[in-house]
């Protein structure tokens, strides 16, 4: 019987040595947003709590400045 091995989650920001997450770095922020526009939780992405807080703040700032959409599905 084959066993299913789940891939180990790791924090990308810790591995790359990132100090602060910038709200202008849209490519990074888009990786942590679902297709409906919600922020993906850290239990799914493996991001550490410190960086998850920075990520949420950066995404909210980018949304406020209209760099990112609040939702992707407007009346479909």
Swiss-Prot record:
Database matches in SUPFAM superfamilies: Ribosomal protein S18
What are the recorded GO MF terms, alphabetically?
Answer: small ribosomal subunit rRNA binding; structural constituent of ribosome
Q: Which residues form the signal peptide?
A: none
Alphabetized UniProt keyword annotations: Ribonucleoprotein, Ribosomal protein, RNA-binding, rRNA-binding
Gene3D superfamilies, per this entry?
Ribosomal protein S18
The record, for InterPro entries, names: Ribosomal_bS18, Ribosomal_bS18_CS, Ribosomal_bS18_sf
Is this entry keyworded RNA-binding? Answer: yes
What is the stated purpose of this protein?
Answer: Binds as a heterodimer with protein bS6 to the central domain of the 16S rRNA, where it helps stabilize the platform of the 30S subunit.
Give the record's family classification.
Belongs to the bacterial ribosomal protein bS18 family.
What is the protein name stated in its UniProt record? Small ribosomal subunit protein bS18
Q: Which organism is it from?
A: Stutzerimonas stutzeri (strain A1501) (Pseudomonas stutzeri)
The organism that produces this protein has a lineage beginning with: Bacteria, Pseudomonadati, Pseudomonadota, Gammaproteobacteria, Pseudomonadales
Name of encoding gene:
rpsR
């Amino acid at each position: 019987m084959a066993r299913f091995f789940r891939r180990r989650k790791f924090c990308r920001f810790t591995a790359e040595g990132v100090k602060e997450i910038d709200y202008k770095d849209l490519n990074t922020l888009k990786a942590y947003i679902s297709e409906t526009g919600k922020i993906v939780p850290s239990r799914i992405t493996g991001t550490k709590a410190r960086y998850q807080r920075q990520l949420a703040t950066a995404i909210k700032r980018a949304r406020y400045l209209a760099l990112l959409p609040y939702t992707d599905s407007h009346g479909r």
